[in-house]
């Protein structure tokens, strides 16, 4: 069964690389929004370290597009896509944040705890976050990118054998091209389809005030 799934995934990648698909994406024009905070990238490193040390991603909703006193204004979705260091998407999810909200996520236990390819999870990889406004958070859909979110991540460094230290950096803004805007949610849908339960990262306990937005 796993062999069949891998074969299907290979066919899906081939389809994504086909001229027809590329032409369809190119026709979409530039990305919806290119300001800071729309599309952000960072890395995780030494996940499987001997000390068992974890890494953390913190996402802040700046509240720039809504009044936090209103129950429906200012909400935003953090579409999160995690890759290993061979460029394969392994997990994805979309987490709701209210205005001025702080979402804290564990790399080991939430962002890379249910990889498509199973365990062991990769030690190093890339985390991509797209700020998206919609009425229901879903990483398989990316329709209204905006610059609501700020993100920071800690990293486990190993300067010498047996010694681990923690550093922290802000996520780096990237350019959300129309190709990337189309690729990320489509690849996520393949990950969820092929994973049959695997490939979904975890946003943590649900906040009752986020019920109308939910997480996926």
Locate the predicted segments by residue.
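Gly/Pro-rich, tryptophan- and cysteine-flecked surface segments typical
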Residues: 21-216
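Bacterial N-terminal signal peptides
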Residues: 8-19
């Amino acid at each position: 069964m796993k062999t069949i799934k891998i074969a299907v995934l290979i066919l899906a990648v081939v389809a994504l690389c086909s001229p027809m698909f590329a032409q369809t994406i190119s026709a979409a024009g530039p990305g919806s929004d290119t300001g800071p905070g729309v599309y952000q990238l960072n890395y995780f490193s030494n996940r499987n370290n001997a000390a068992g040390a974890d890494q953390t991603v913190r996402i802040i909703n700046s509240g720039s597009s809504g009044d936090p006193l209103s129950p429906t204004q200012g909400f935003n979705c953090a579409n999160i896509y995690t890759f290993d260091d061979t460029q394969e998407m392994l997990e994805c999810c979309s987490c709701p944040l209210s205005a001025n909200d702080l979402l804290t996520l564990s790399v080991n236990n939430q962002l890379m705890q249910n990889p498509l390819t199973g365990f062991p999870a990769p030690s190093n990889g890339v985390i991509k976050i797209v700020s998206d406004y919609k009425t229901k958070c879903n990483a398989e859909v990316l329709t209204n990118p905006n610059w609501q979110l700020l993100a920071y991540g800690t990293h486990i460094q190993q300067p010498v054998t047996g010694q681990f230290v923690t550093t922290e950096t802000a996520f780096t803004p990237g350019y959300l091209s129309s190709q990337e805007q189309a690729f990320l949610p489509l690849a996520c849908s393949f990950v969820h389809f092929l994973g049959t339960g695997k490939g979904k990262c975890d946003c943590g306990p649900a906040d009752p005030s986020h019920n109308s937005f939910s997480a996926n």
